[in-house]
Design a protein with these regions (language model features):
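FNR/FR-type flavoprotein reductase catalytic core
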Residues: 89-196
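Ferredoxin-reductase
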Residues: 4-101
């Protein structure tokens, strides 16, 4: 039975320990990749690089999956980058979200790919395939990362050139970022590659 993402929060039971947030933007990059942003609760704290469980409201028990947070810890919204899995318990419905839809988010983020777990050094190498770039998207937009490393090297590999667009857009937007723009211009190296 398909999940209806249009259900208003007052029409379903909200599980304990869950925020109900609103989709603020959606961008489809390819037939298999998309990015979306949701509102951020004032009480939600996370460290750049962490992940959180998200789901969609429905009449039955919601299905939750772990998603890396692609936005930095200082951002006023929460960004996610996802693959579209046609028969995925969550992604088959999540890929259809639109601005204004509700998304469920557990209140406790977690993860170890965070700045305070990284030892300072000359270079930070970040190797990602596909949507695995999401936690690195968070880290390269965090000023703390640039305080710990002289050079950040982001290697992003996908099957086809079109699948690299999120990474290209991300790095291009860093130039205008008021917090890390100058640092990223001097220290961030982006190596996009394809396998086909």
């Amino acid at each position: 039975m398909p999940i209806k993402v249009e259900i208003a929060p007052e029409q379903f039971e909200i599980p304990k320990g869950v925020f109900v947030e609103t989709v603020s933007s959606v961008q489809h990059y390819t037939e298999s990749l998309f990015q979306f942003r949701i509102t951020r609760p004032a009480s939600f704290r996370f460290r750049s690089g962490e992940f959180v469980m998200i789901g969609l409201p429905n009449a039955q028990k919601p299905v939750f999956r772990a998603y890396s947070i692609a936005s930095p810890s200082w951002d006023e919204e929460i960004e996610f980058y996802s693959i579209k899995v046609p028969d995925g318990p969550l992604t088959q419905h999540l890929q259809k979200v639109q601005v204004g839809d509700s998304v469920l988010m557990r209140k406790k983020p977690t993860g170890t790919l965070v700045n305070d777990a990284l030892l300072p050094g000359k270079r930070l190498y970040m190797f990602a395939t596909g949507t695995g770039i999401a936690p690195f998207a968070s880290l390269i937009r965090d000023p703390d990362t640039y305080e710990k490393f002289d050079r950040l090297i982001l290697c992003h590999t996908c099957r086809q050139v079109a699948e690299l667009r999120y990474g290209h857009d991300l790095v291009a937007a860093l130039k205008d970022d008021p917090l890390v723009g100058d640092l990223a211009a001097q220290r961030l190296i982006h190596y996009p590659t394809v396998t086909r």
